[in-house]
Amino acid sequence: MKIHLSLLTSLVLLSGCNAGDPVMVYESRNALQCETTGISPSESAAKLSAEDIEVTETVCGRRTGVAYPAACGMGTGTILIHKIAEADLAVAKKIGFQKVAELVDLDAGTGYEFVDCEKE
């Protein structure tokens, strides 16, 4: 009986530890109008992989609700979005990524949208 109780207690405690829940993180592409499209999706994902963070999905995006002046050398608001395990979020933040959900501010009218990535 004690073994069953210990096993049951262990299972209950471990059930709250789902390190695999996904979270979406992003970084700026650092693209400049008239000059460069910035870093590629694979280069961005490689930064996470170098920290032993598994990237399960990568998409391109664009910040919304933010004005970018139309002038060569100015930013574009394009971002790279990756799906990773929530357990890896702290490490991802240390290397410059942020949760994409933090871009959404309903009061300010800001957010993000998915866009097609150009072919690498």
Short names for language-model regions:
Residues 1-4:
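Positively charged n-region of N-terminal signal peptides that target proteins for export
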Residues 30-35, 76-82:
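Second-shell loop/turn segments in exported
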Residues 31-67:
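Surface-exposed, low-hydrophobicity interaction/linker segments
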